[in-house]
C-alpha cells in the first residue's frame, strides 16, 4: 500500500508528509535545539541536570578533544559503550560534531560480542564506563582500538560527592573488577583538553552514515545497520509528527520545552536513541535518564521526584513496575504518553496499565533497520489494542506472499516497509543487504503481518517463529498473549519443538508469580482457551526466561535448551 492510503486515517493534527529538507544533518538538529532551548533542562541523571547550553558546551569540548588530540578522521568509527548516564549524550553528539560515525555498543556485551562488533565496525576509539574496564582490557588487545576514554559515575558531581560516589561504586559495592588500562584518558580530562578549541566543521550530507546500529542478535550474529543522517532526521520528524496529535484541549499532545520524558530503556538501543535523544531534543524537552531500570524500587523512587509526562517502555518493564508494591503511590496525573515497542505488548499488561495509571499504552512497531519507528498507534482513545497502529507519515507498507507478490488487505504475509527512515544497508555485507532490501527500496522485515481494511497493522509473528502442527499454523504471540492473562503467570514464551506425530509441537515456558501455579492448572487453562493443535504439548516452569538487556525474550536460547 502506498503512503496516501493512510492519509484519511491519521489522528487530528498529524500531518501526512514530513519536510525532508528541514535539516541538513543530525548535527544541525542538535545545534539548533541547543541554541533555541539553551536554558531548558536537556538530560537529568543521579541528581544532576544538564541544560541544552551545557550539553552544547560539553559536547563541543568532547568534539574538540577528538579533533585536536587524536588523529581520528571524518568517517572513522567510535564506539560508545555506556548505560543511561550524562556522558552518553555528550559523547554521542560530540563524536558526530567531530565528523565520526557512532557505534552504539551494549555495555552488557560479553567479550566475544564486543570483539565481533569492534572488529566488524573497525572501531578506532571507545568511550566506556569504568565498571566495564576489565572487559575492555580483555578485548582491546585483540582489536584495532587506539583511543580509550574512560568515564566514571561521579564525573559530573561536585568534587567531594563525585569522589565519594566513585569510591563507593569501586571499593564498597565492588562494582569495578580489577583492570589495568594505562593508555586510557579520563572523560573529564578529555573535556578539559578539548574545551575552547575551535571546531573544524566537516561537510556532512543527509546520505552520510551517522550511526552503525548493530541488530539485537535475536536472529543470530549481529550486523551493523548503516543509519544515515537522513534516516535519523526523517524518523525523528516522523515520530515528532505523530506526537503532534491534538489532545482534548485542541493543542498538540507534546509541547515544546514542557515535557518530562522518563528514559528507562538504554539510549544505546535504537528505540530510545531516536525517541529520547532525537525526538525530545528537537522539541526542547527534558529526558530523565534511568541508569538501572532493573532496580525497580530505585526506579520508582526516582519517578517520585518528577512530574513526568511521558514514559517509553516495553512489556516486561511495565509488568515489573506494576508488580512493585510502591507503584500505586506514584502520581500519574501528568502522564499523557506511554509508548511500547521492542517486543509485543500483551493485552493483559496494557489493560492493567491503563487501569492503574489512567494512561493508555500506545504500541508501535519498528526495527533497527528502520531507525527504528515504522508505525505507531494514535494516542488516547484512538489507540487500537492488539495492533501496532498505522505507518508513520511518509512510510509505505505492504504484505507479500512467499513469491513476493503483494497480498490484499486482511491477508497475512511478510511485512515490507519503504520510507526515508529505511537504512542504507548492512555494513560491509552486500549479500545480506541484497536479501533484505530490494531494488525499489522495500525492506523485508521477516515479520508476518496483516494490514486491516481500516489501515491498522497487526504483527502476527516472526516468520521463523511460526510453528506448524499437523499442517496448521500456530503463532507463538497468540499463545503467549492468552497465557499472560492467567493471574498467576508473570512471563512466558512459546517455541516449536520437533514431534514425531505432528511434525512440530508447542512448548510453553512459564515463570509464575509469587503465589505459584501448577502444571495441571496451566494445562486446564490452555485446553479451555485453545483449539486442539494450539494447546502446548510441553509445559515447563522456570524461575526466569533468557532475555536481551532491553527485555526481549530470547526464544533462540530456549530452542537451544529444548
For the regions a language model picked out, list residue spans one by one.
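Conserved AMP-binding/adenylate-forming
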Residues: 22, 45-52, 63-112, 130, ...
Amino acid at each position: 500500500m502506498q503512503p496516501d492510503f493512510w492519509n484519511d486515517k491519521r489522528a487530528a493534527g498529524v500531518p501526512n508528509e514530513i519536510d525532508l529538507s528541514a535539516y541538513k544533518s543530525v548535527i544541525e538538529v542538535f545545534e539548533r535545539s541547543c541554541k533555541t532551548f539553551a536554558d531548558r533542562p536537556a538530560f537529568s541523571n543521579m541528581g544532576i541536570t544538564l541544560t541544552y547550553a551545557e550539553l552544547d558546551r560539553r559536547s563541543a569540548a568532547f568534539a574538540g578533544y577528538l579533533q585536536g588530540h587524536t588523529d581520528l578522521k571524518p568517517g572513522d568509527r567510535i564506539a560508545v559503550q555506556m548505560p543511561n548516564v550524562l556522558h552518553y549524550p555528550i559523547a554521542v553528539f560530540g563524536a558526530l560534531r567531530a565528523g565520526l560515525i557512532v557505534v552504539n555498543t551494549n555495555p552488557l556485551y560479553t567479550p566475544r560480542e564486543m570483539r565481533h562488533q569492534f572488529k566488524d565496525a573497525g572501531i578506532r576509539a571507545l568511550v566506556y564506563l569504568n565498571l566495564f574496564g576489565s572487559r575492555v582490557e580483555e578485548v582491546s588487545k585483540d582489536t584495532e582500538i587506539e583511543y580509550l576514554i574512560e568515564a566514571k559515575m561521579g564525573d559530573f558531581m561536585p568534587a567531594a560527592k563525585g569522589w565519594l560516589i566513585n569510591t563507593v561504586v569501586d571499593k564498597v559495592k565492588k562494582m569495578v573488577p580489577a583492570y589495568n588500562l594505562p593508555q586510557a584518558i579520563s572523560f573529564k580530562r578529555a573535556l578539559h583538553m578539548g574545551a575552547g578549541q575551535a571546531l573544524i566543521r566537516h561537510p556532512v550530507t543527509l546520505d552520510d552514515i551517522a550511526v552503525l546500529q548493530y541488530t539485537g542478535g535475536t536472529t543470530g550474529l549481529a550486523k551493523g545497520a548503516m543509519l544515515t543522517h537522513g534516516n535519523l532526521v526523517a524518523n525523528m520528524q516522523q515520530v515528532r509528527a505523530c506526537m503532534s496529535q491534538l489532545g482534548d484541549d485542541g493543542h498538540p499532545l507534546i509541547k515544546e520545552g514542557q515535557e518530562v520524558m522518563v528514559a528507562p530503556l538504554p539510549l544505546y538501543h535504537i528505540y530510545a536513541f531516536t525517541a529520547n535523544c532525537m525526538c525530545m531534543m528537537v522539541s526542547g524537552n527534558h529526558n530523565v535518564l534511568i541508569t538501572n531500570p532493573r532496580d525497580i524500587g530505585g526506579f520508582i523512587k526516582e519517578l517520585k521526584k518528577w512530574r513526568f509526562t511521558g514514559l517509553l517502555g516495553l512489556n516486561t518493564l511495565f509488568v515489573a513496575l506494576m508488580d512493585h508494591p510502591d507503584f500505586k503511590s506514584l502520581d500519574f496525573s501528568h502522564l499523557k504518553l506511554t509508548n511500547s515497542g521492542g517486543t509485543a505488548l500483551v493485552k493483559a499488561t496494557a489493560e492493567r496499565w491503563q487501569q492503574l495509571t489512567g494512561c493508555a499504552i500506545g504500541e508501535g512497531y519498528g526495527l533497527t533497520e528502520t531507525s527504528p519507528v515504522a508505525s505507531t498507534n494514535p494516542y488516547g482513545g484512538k489507540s487500537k489494542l492488539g495492533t501496532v497502529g498505522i505507518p508513520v507519515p511518509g512510510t509505505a507498507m505492504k504484505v507479500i506472499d512467499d513469491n513476493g507478490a503483494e497480498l490484499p488487505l486482511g491477508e497475512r504475509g511478510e511485512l515490507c516497509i519503504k520510507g526515508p527512515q529505511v537504512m542504507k544497508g548492512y555494513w560491509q555485507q552486500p549479500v545480506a543487504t541484497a536479501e533484505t532490501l530490494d531494488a525499489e527500496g522495500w525492506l523485508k522485515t521477516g515479520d508476518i503481518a496483516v494490514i486491516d481494511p481500516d489501515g491498522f497493522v497487526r504483527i502476527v509473528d516472526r516468520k521463523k517463529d511460526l510453528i506448524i502442527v499437523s499442517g496448521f499454523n500456530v503463532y507463538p504471540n497468540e499463545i503467549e498473549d492468552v497465557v499472560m492473562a492467567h493471574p498467576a503467570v508473570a512471563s512466558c514464551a512459546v517455541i516449536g519443538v520437533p514431534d514425531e506425530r505432528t511434525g512440530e509441537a508447542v512448548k510453553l515456558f512459564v515463570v509464575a508469580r509469587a503465589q505459584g501455579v501448577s502444571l495441571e492448572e496451566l494445562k486446564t487453562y490452555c485446553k479451555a482457551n485453545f483449539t486442539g493443535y494450539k494447546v502446548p504439548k510441553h509445559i515447563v516452569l522456570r524461575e526466569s526466561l533468557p532475555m536481551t538487556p532491553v527485555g526481549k525474550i530470547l526464544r533462540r536460547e530456549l530452542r537451544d535448551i529444548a
